[in-house]
Structures are given as C-alpha cells and as structure tokens.
Design a protein with these regions (language model features):
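Flexible glycine-rich, low-complexity coil/linker segments exposed to the extracellular/periplasmic environment
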Residues: 1, 43-101, 160-175, 278-303
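Surface-exposed extracellular loop regions of Gram-negative outer-membrane beta-barrel proteins
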Residues: 30-32, 82, 100-104, 162-163, ...
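Transmembrane beta-strands of outer-membrane beta-barrel proteins
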Residues: 18-24, 128-136, 202-204, 260-262, ...
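Transmembrane beta-strands of outer-membrane beta-barrel pores
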Residues: 24-32, 121, 137-144, 206-212, ...
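Gram-negative outer-membrane beta-barrel transporters
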Residues: 266-269, 273-278, 285-392, 431
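Outer-membrane beta-barrel signature, preferentially recognizing the C-terminal barrel domain
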Residues: 102-109, 181, 210-269, 292-320, ...
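Short loop/turn motifs that connect adjacent beta-strands in outer-membrane beta-barrel proteins
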Residues: 11-20, 35, 122-132, 199, ...
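C-terminal beta-signal and adjacent terminal beta-strands/loops
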Residues: 44, 331, 384-393, 414-463
Length: 463
C-alpha cells in the first residue's frame, strides 16, 4: 500500500473564531497473489488402511457417539514432501490448474480531497452555546484487476490424466480477463451541538457515509451453470453503499461521575449491494465480453440493487457509585442497549423487513459491573447479540444464512503490584457459549463453533 496525504489549518481573524481545514489524500492498494509452484494434492493408492490418530476427538463424536477415523497431515507429509511417495498419486492437473486460478491481481486507487469549517454561532448568550462542524469530502476511486477463468467446455477427466499440463493450458491459458471500474462521489456532513444547561447537552447531525465493496468483487470470476443456462460473474463497477444519516442525542451528566444518554438515528442506504441479480442476457459475437461464448445465457452478478432504511434507538448509562458505604463505594456500572428496525427494496415491488437486510443486528446490549479496592480491581461484562442475517441472495431465499443469538460473560481481575506494574487475569466466554449459524430456519443448522473458555494471564508494566 502507498499513501500520500497533506492537511492545512487556518483560523480566520474574525470576531467569532472560525477554523478552516482542508486536505488531500492519494492511496493505492495492490493485492497480488502468485501460485507459480501451484498448490498440490495427492490421492492414496495404498492397499491397506493407514493408522489413525486416537488423540483427536471431534465434535460429532461428542454429540452422537460416533467415532470417525481422523488423520493429521503431518502423519504423511513433512516439509512439503511425502514421507512415503509410493503410497500416493499426485493430481498433477490440479497443480497446473492452480497456477492459473491462484494467480491474480487487483489494484484500488483512491484520490480524495476535503474542506471543513468549525466554530460557534456567536460569542455570547444562546449562540455561544451552539457549535458547528461542517464540510465535504470528494473521492474518486479507480480499480483494475486481472486473472484467469475456466473456458466454457473444459477438458475431460481422461485428457487431464493423459496430459495434465496441456489440459490445464487448454482450459485456462486463453481466458485471461482484464477488468476495470470506478466511481466519483461526494460526502457532505453537518454537526451541531448545544449546551442547554451545564449538565445537559444536545447533538444533532446530518451526514453522508459510505462502505466500499470488498476488493474480491473486482477480480475476474465466472461460474457457469449449463443446466440453467446462467453465468455468475463479478462486477468491477460496483458502487459503494452510501447512507444519508440523521442522528440526535441528549446527554445528561450528573454527580457523582455519571452519564445518561438517549439517541435516535435514521439512515437511508442507497446502492445496497445484493448478489444473484439478473442483469440480462448475453449477446452473440466475439465482442460479447466472453470471447464469443455463452450467447443466450443469463448473466447473474452482484449489483447495487436498491435501498434500505435503518432507524432505531440507543440508550446508555454509566456511573461510579462512590456514594455507597464502605467497600461498596468502589463499585461502578454501565449498560447500553440498541434496538434497530430495517426494511429495504432490492428490486421489484417487494419490501424486505429486518430479517432480510444484511449487515445490521436488530437487538444488542452490554452490561458491566466493576469494583476497585486498594490494589485489587475486577470487572464482569455481559454481552448480548441478537439473531441477525449474514448472507442474503435474491435467487435462493430459502438458503439465506443467519446467526443465532449469542450471550457471553467475561471476567477480568487485576492486582497492582506497584503503580507501574499490574498483574492481570482475564477469563473470556465464562459459560462457553457457542456460535451457531443456520440456513433459512433455525432447525437447519449450518455450523456450530464452540470457542471454549479462554484464560489469559499478563503483566503490564510502564518503565
């Protein structure tokens, strides 16, 4: 990555101070993958079963009682070399194929500039208690990529076995794709603050924001379904998801050392990124973008296909309980809760509700309780993350992927040996809560990850 940037700041000599700031940035990210030696794999051709590793216990055995034989790769290969080559036959076609599919490159270049102003509306009275921050960022992004894809009618298994090097070249050598894309966008924003009293502050903001698509979207990729006459490709012209945001917050500060905050937010997201979008039929002729093949096929791709609206509330509270008697005065606590409702339209006349809009967690909460006494301190943290959708496809709604609710408890302990040295003990996921994903409905579990309970000890020092 290469990054160049410069900023300038100037305070206007006016009765009401105004600070101006401007800046420019140029950034280039190059991601290159080379598989010159190729990835390799082998097939066992021996006549007898190989010894298994009895020390491996799998989740399936714990849940069902079945004992499935398990092997570790280090039992058969060391330093990328087979321990006993006579027992294995290499898939040479796979190795040669990976030299093409594993070699690719993508470059993203961003050129941007911004200007902003900050100050107060007045010097005295009501306007002196009102501040502002406003500005705009203009950004241009260009991307280029190249890579190999498989030709429509690949080599047969017999051809791959007889001459794997030539078969791989036949499948890939003449189907290198070079893609380009880009966009230019501006992102203005305005933020206001007002102190109603010494302990009550209000905030109001209108802003625009964006989220760039992943760079993998710009790499050449073609997945062909001959039965359905479709080809799924990447889209190098994907725009960023943009959002117009309204945020309003009230903060109340109280003694001893406490804060209560209530916030409301509303976001309108445009150019929402959706996969499996039908972008039309591929034409005929050598200039159809696919060397003259796939005419009549339906092109499916990832596209900026609609809008989403997100709004909700945030509540937070934190306080030190120094007014309590005795040992309890070392207590402090905090809590926050977020509730989100979403809906979106990704093409057609059907609006999708919260359960179908990717990237948002409808319900989330955190609570913590801390206690400090002399050199000893401890903290208990509870985290709740509600169920949410992870993957959405307009072409296969029944296979949308969701994550189940997750509740975790973490405990932290610390002892101050001296002001510059602390000993710590942190226990994560105290209840060993698993992460569970499912497809379509909760009974169709896709995967479960048991993270386990992690205990870590540390020494922190300042010298």
């Amino acid at each position: 990555m290469r990054d160049l940037r410069g900023n300038a700041r100037y305070v206007l000599p006016t009765p009401i101070p105004v600070t101006l700031k401007t800046g420019v940035q140029w950034r280039e990210i190059l991601v290159q993958q080379l598989q010159l030696g190729g990835s390799r794999r082998w097939t066992y051709v021996g006549t007898g079963a190989r010894p298994t590793d009895p020390g491996l216990t799998m989740f399936d055995e714990i849940k069902t009682g079945r004992r499935t034989p398990q092997w570790e790769a280090t039992m058969f290969i060391r330093d990328r070399t087979l321990i006993n080559p006579t027992l294995w036959s290499e898939d040479v076609f796979y190795r040669e194929q990976q030299k093409y599919t594993g070699t690719k490159e993508v470059t993203e270049t961003v050129s941007a500039a911004f200007v902003m102003a900050e100050g107060k509306l007045g010097r005295q009275g009501l306007f002196a208690r009102t501040g502002y921050l406003t500005g705009v960022r203009i950004e241009g992004t260009a991307n280029e990529s190249w890579g190999w894809v498989r030709q429509r009618f690949g080599s047969t298994a017999a051809e791959q076995q007889a001459d794997p090097v030539r078969a791989a070249a036949r499948d890939y050598a003449n189907t290198r794709r070079n893609l380009k894309g880009g966009y230019t966008k501006s992102f203005p924003s305005t933020h206001l603050t007002h102190d109603f009293t010494s302990s009550l502050r209000g905030r109001l903001a209108w802003s625009t924001s964006f989220g760039r698509p992943g760079m993998s979207n710009w790499l050449p990729n073609e997945s062909v379904n001959e039965a359905n006459q479709t080809i799924t490709v990447n889209n190098p012209d994907l725009l960023p998801q943009t959002a117009t945001n309204w945020d309003a917050t009230l903060d109340y500060y109280f003694e001893p050392v406490g804060n209560l905050s209530v916030g409301w937010f509303h976001k309108t997201i445009k150019d929402y990124i959706v996969s499996g979008v039908n972008t039309g039929m591929i034409g005929s002729g050598n200039d159809n973008g696919y060397n003259g093949v796939y005419d009549g096929f339906t092109r499916l791709t990832t596209s900026n296909a609609g809008t989403a609206v997100v709004q909700g509330w945030e509540f937070s509270y934190q306080q030190q309980f120094t007014f309590l008697p005795g040992l309890l005065k070392g207590l402090s606590g905090s809590a926050n809760y977020t509730a989100i409702e979403t809906h979106g339209n990704f093409g057609g006349n059907i609006n999708s509700e919260t359960s179908k809009v990717v990237g948002f967690i409808p319900r989330a909460a955190n609570m913590s309780l801390s206690w400090r006494y002399k050199r000893f301190s401890t903290r208990l943290l509870y985290n709740y993350t509600g169920s949410y959708i992870v993957e959405y496809s307009a072409a296969a709604v029944g296979f949308n992927r969701y994550r189940m609710p997750l509740k975790t408890i973490n405990l932290g302990l610390a002892y101050m040996v001296r002001p510059a040295v602390n000993i710590t003990c942190d226990i994560s996921n105290l209840t060993n809560a698993p992460q569970v994903w499912y497809r379509g409905f909760t009974e169709r579990m896709q995967s479960t990850i048991i993270n386990g309970i992690a205990v870590s000890f540390g020494v922190n020092g300042r010298f």
